[in-house]
Amino acid sequence: MRVLRYAALLLSVVTLAGCGNEVEVELVWGGPPQPDPGGVVSVNGFRTFQDNVDEHWEGSAAMAAAEFLRLDERTVTRTTIDGKASSEGTGPQTVTVTLDGLLDDSIRAERWTLGFEQVNETYRLTAALREQRCQPGRGHQEFSAEPCV
């Protein structure tokens, strides 16, 4: 659903740009879409967003992960960001973001595993997986894509 909202926003920006007025519109990423039952999250909307912006966060896989997840809008007790690059320091990178202490009755924590590929000076999101850990008594205590109760 967010992809459709983003497409509508992009269309209105293009429409405004074609009017000849010098109207500046700042594009804002709305956050990741809902995962499928296996925890896989589509990255297509974010890649389109990246195609239309030139921001400092694109130069770091960890900062791009923070933008994709909209960490600036999340309220948690603890956020952990762990980045791993290939042995030579170039090539694909994996960023794991753990959000612990969520203000939710069922879900205690979320873990996001994000794949990035460096293209010139930017890190492009290639894959996203969301797993969750349930509150005690509300389901599984290990990270899993399975829902909490």
Regions found by a protein language model. Give the residues of each.
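A small/polar (G/S/T-enriched), proline-flanked helix-loop surface module common
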Residues: 44-51, 83-84, 144
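Post-signal peptide N-terminal segment of mature Sec-exported envelope proteins
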Residues: 27-47
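Short beta-strand edge/turn micro-motifs at domain boundaries
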Residues: 114-143
